[in-house]
Amino acid sequence: MLKLTKKADYGLIALKHLAMRPPTGESEWGSASAKEIADTYGVPLPLLSKILQKLARAGFLRSEHGTNGGYRLARDPRLITALEVIRAIDGPIILTACFTEHGGHDCHHSEKCIVREPLRKVHEGILRLLSNITISDIASEEGLAEPDAHARASARLYGLELTAGLR
């Protein structure tokens, strides 16, 4: 089964929350504490704190200390893709052992494999879909593009359902 890890899901939720915050001071985006985000969405605070720290280290967030501290976006949400966020939290997205994220393969059966090429197409379709969804799209929910026909067809071949929304 293909699904986002809870960490990636929580990271996307936090970035959406921050993208929707009204601007404060000199910043285009408002800030929120880890506790506020955790309480709003029922996410465990210790886990969310680790995710937010990871997103800050990856350059997606700025951490601000003090009484009005918290996290705010460090980059324009129109330029942050779901794929970048998922990679920052979970590492490379690898559908099967047939190949790595960058096209190599790590399977002893690849010479005789009859599903390698269709799986490669599904893998590429998923990466393409995730790279075309931005935090701004997720925040607006109107801008989510439909998966391209090739990605949908490849996914159907394996009984997967690709939808643009992250529900």
What is each residue range found by the language model?
Residues 2, 6, 12-43:
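N-terminal helix-turn-helix DNA-binding core of bacterial DNA-binding proteins
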Residues 39, 56-57:
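Alpha-helical residues within the helix-turn-helix
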Residues 46:
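Key DNA-contact positions within bacterial/archaeal DNA-binding proteins
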Residues 52-53:
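Short, hydrophobic-biased segments on the C-terminal half of alpha helices
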Residues 59-74:
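Beta-hairpin "wing" of winged helix-turn-helix
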Residues 77-102, 115-124:
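Conserved segment of winged-helix/HTH DNA-binding domains
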Residues 100-167:
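C-terminal regulatory/oligomerization modules of transcriptional regulators
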